């Protein structure tokens, strides 16, 4: 087996593993959203609950981060190390901004008198908390992988011919973005 064939097989294997992981995550969130739908018929469900403004802003942050991560991938494919560095760092800032905005959103929910646990909590806010925190946990994995990608990039491990790590990171990041958009729209409507 040649070196190129080995790299091709390795890339396919990593992509397949990531695909299986994303399918598993999709199934978990499908279960959570199904439980959400079933629970909406409860008499104690908050009918007038609205998502906090910070969740809207965070949605734009995560969508923008998907674009910048894609631009980083395109830059490395052209061997443009400087642009890759810039786009990776912008992606990191936007990813962290998303997390910060989510916590600001939690604060906005509590400020309106809606709690996630305890005697003053509701099933609505508890479900919202579970779904968004589960997404944040998966995003934490995305941020860790992004930090590893940034580290490897600054160690000059990526080039136009070797960009599998960035490609896998972009694939997972896009998945997280699409997942959040789905969850956001689901929670909004």
Identify what each model region corresponds to.
Residues 1-189:
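...captures the hydrophobic TM-helix bundle architecture rather than a specific catalytic motif
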């Amino acid at each position: 087996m040649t070196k190129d064939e080995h790299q091709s097989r390795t890339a396919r294997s990593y992509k397949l593993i990531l695909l299986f992981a994303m399918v598993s995550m999709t199934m978990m969130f499908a279960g959570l959203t199904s439980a959400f739908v079933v629970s909406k018929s409860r008499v104690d469900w908050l009918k007038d609950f609205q998502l906090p403004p910070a969740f809207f802003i965070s949605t734009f942050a995560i969508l923008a981060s998907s674009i910048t991560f894609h631009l980083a991938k395109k830059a490395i494919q052209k061997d443009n190390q400087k642009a890759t560095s810039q786009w990776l760092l912008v992606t990191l800032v936007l990813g962290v901004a998303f997390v910060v905005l989510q916590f600001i959103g939690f604060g906005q929910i509590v400020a309106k008198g809606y709690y996630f646990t305890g005697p003053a909590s509701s099933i609505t806010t508890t479900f919202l908390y579970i779904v968004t925190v589960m997404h944040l946990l998966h995003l934490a994995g995305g941020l860790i992988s992004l930090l590893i990608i940034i580290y490897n990039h600054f160690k000059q491990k990526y080039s136009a011919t070797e960009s599998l790590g960035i490609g896998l990171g972009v694939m997972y990041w896009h998945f997280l973005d699409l997942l959040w958009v789905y969850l956001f729209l689901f929670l909004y409507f």
